[in-house]
């Protein structure tokens, strides 16, 4: 992300927060990171609202930490800057090998999302939501109007912006690492990927 020109980060912590904070504080990137402990999780949108002063009025990248994404982030940012008119969010997508386990999308010829299906029995596609977004600051105003402390970005925000969400396809590597099996698999896959590209 730093190679793409991103210079400041905010990370919310909760589970095993002391270990996470200790790791980050010893990192060479520590001076670029603001750590925010949430005793009770505010959900993705709630965290954004609570830290809107950190974001100011600029577009920001919103990343779910239980994913491992390897891609050209400069290209991702460029795609957002050059997105179609009237779109306010750019969602990273990827091809999933298990579409029943995640949110899948249907997009039009312009790359704009027309349908979103969250963990359905008969998913209509294998193009999945990578839970990595570039978001215009105007979206924060909408989230604030919900008058909720806890705002789920996938449930409370994405449906409202249907037809106004552009997509960026990550064809290099993306995996949900929210459980031990997928985390171990990601280590094997990325090790192999780095060997192939080095």
Question: Predicted regions: what is each one?
Answer:
Residues 84-95:
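A short, conserved acidic/glycine-rich loop-to-beta-strand motif
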Residues 32-33, 85-86, 112-116:
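Rossmann-fold dehydrogenase core element
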Residues 8, 93, 106, 134-136, ...:
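Short, well-ordered beta-strand micro-motif
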Residues 106-112:
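Short acidic-glycine loop/turn motifs at beta-strand connectors
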Residues 35, 89, 165-167:
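Conserved beta-strand scaffold positions in the cores of enzyme catalytic domains, especially
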Residues 1-64, 68, 75, 142, ...:
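Conserved N-terminal catalytic core of the sugar/cofactor nucleotidyltransferase
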Residues 61, 68, 74-81, 97, ...:
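Catalytic-core segments of class I nucleotidyltransferases/pyrophosphorylases
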């Amino acid at each position: 992300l730093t190679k793409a020109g991103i210079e400041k980060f905010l990370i919310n912590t909760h589970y095993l927060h002391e270990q996470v904070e200790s790791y980050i504080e010893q990192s060479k990137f520590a001076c670029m990171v603001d750590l925010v402990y949430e005793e009770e999780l505010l959900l993705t949108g709630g965290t954004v609202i609570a830290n809107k002063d950190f974001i100011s009025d600029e577009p920001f990248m919103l990343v779910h930490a239980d994913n491992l994404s390897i891609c050209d982030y400069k290209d991702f940012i460029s795609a957002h800057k050059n997105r179609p008119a009237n779109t306010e969010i750019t969602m990273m997508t990827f091809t999933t090998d298990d579409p029943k386990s995640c949110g899948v999308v249907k997009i039009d010829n312009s790359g704009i999302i027309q349908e979103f299906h969250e963990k359905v029995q008969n998913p209509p596609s294998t193009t999945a939501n990578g839970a990595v977004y570039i978001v215009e600051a105007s979206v924060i105003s909408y989230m604030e109007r919900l008058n909720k402390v806890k705002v789920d970005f996938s449930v409370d925000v994405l449906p409202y912006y249907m037809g106004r969400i552009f997509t960026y396809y990550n064809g290099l590597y993306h995996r949900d690492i929210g459980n031990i099996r997928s985390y171990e698999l990601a280590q094997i896959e990325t090790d192999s990927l780095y060997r192939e590209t080095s």
